[in-house]
């Protein structure tokens, strides 16, 4: 489990943009995971706590709406919430080429534009884009568990539920969701504590 101290300065700063925040417990997430039978069957076999946390953030926002921000994510400016129906994503980075991606990550040329999984939000309960992302995570998780690597590498974790999932689904399906908004990198800064890494 997470052992690093929570960077409260980011949380305090972000309250100026989103005054009502809540902390979600493991119990809350486990209850939501039961809504996806394939995920429920895999849940106790998930090999690393950060995978549960990454899937948990998607589940929570899918079922409740609102925004998710990593605790080490700092909002730089007001996020536009002008629409009655929107799914907001943030650009994580733009790579020079896809050869910098991990061995399993999607190498389609458009995937140089990486979508962040450390921040996203919607004002739509059960937004279908998030459903597609969750289903992609479950598919990758099942593959990883069934292939049974002797040692779970950081690249495995990133592929299962990290930014490659939301990036892949964004590029594959963005035209299906007219309310999908991708904001540029000027809205957030991510301190990238990555305390889950070995």
Positions of predicted regions on the chain:
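Small-residue hinge/turn detector
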Residues: 55-66
């Amino acid at each position: 489990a997470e052992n690093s101290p929570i960077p409260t300065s980011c949380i305090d700063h972000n309250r100026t943009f989103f005054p009502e925040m809540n902390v979600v417990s493991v119990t809350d997430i486990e209850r939501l995971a039961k809504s996806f039978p394939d995920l429920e069957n895999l849940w106790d076999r998930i090999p690393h706590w950060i995978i549960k946390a990454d899937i948990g953030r998607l589940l929570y926002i899918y079922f409740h709406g609102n925004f998710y921000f990593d605790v080490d994510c700092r909002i730089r400016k007001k996020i536009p919430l002008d629409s009655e129906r929107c799914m907001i994503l943030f650009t994580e980075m733009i790579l020079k080429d896809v050869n910098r991606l991990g061995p399993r990550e999607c190498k389609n040329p458009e995937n140089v534009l990486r979508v962040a999984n450390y921040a996203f939000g919607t004002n739509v309960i059960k937004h279908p884009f998030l459903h597609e992302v969750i289903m992609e995570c479950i598919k990758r998780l099942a593959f990883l568990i069934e292939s049974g690597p002797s040692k779970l590498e950081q690249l495995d974790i990133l592929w299962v539920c990290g930014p490659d999932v939301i990036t892949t689904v964004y590029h594959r399906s963005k035209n299906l969701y007219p309310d999908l908004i991708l904001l540029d990198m000027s809205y957030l800064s991510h301190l990238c504590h990555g305390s889950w890494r070995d």
